[in-house]
Amino acid sequence: MIFQKIQEFIAEQLSIDKNNIKLESDLKEDLGIDSIDAVGLIIKIEEFFKLEVSDETLQKFKNVKDILEYIQQHVDNYDYLEKK
């Protein structure tokens, strides 16, 4: 469920087909995310998952898997989200 939500947010932010977004997709090289897109994406993630992502952390995200792992580590009720 978390990966699908990330796919949805990226697809919406970049106006691309979510089926082109894979766990290993590089945010810049494969998806073409620039700094403005990244901020928009993170705002969606923060609001949906009720997280705060620092600018330093944002800079560390290289691929979709990095975002997924961060969410899994920081969401309070991860098990509940997976069952939704």
From Swiss-Prot:
The modification O-(pantetheine 4'-phosphoryl)serine is found at S35. One of its GO terms (cellular component) is membrane. GO terms for biological process: lipid A biosynthetic process. Keywords: Cytoplasm, Fatty acid biosynthesis, Fatty acid metabolism, Lipid biosynthesis, Lipid metabolism, Phosphopantetheine, Phosphoprotein. Pathway: Lipid metabolism; fatty acid biosynthesis. One of its GO terms (molecular function) is acyl carrier activity. Carrier of the growing fatty acid chain in fatty acid biosynthesis. 4'-phosphopantetheine is transferred from CoA to a specific serine of apo-ACP by AcpS. This modification is essential for activity because fatty acids are bound in thioester linkage to the sulfhydryl of the prosthetic group. It comes from Phytoplasma mali (strain AT). Its main location: cytoplasm. Belongs to the acyl carrier protein (ACP) family. Pfam families: PP-binding. SUPFAM superfamilies: ACP-like. It comes from the Bacteria. This is Acyl carrier protein. Residues 1-75 form the Carrier domain. It is found in: Cytoplasm.
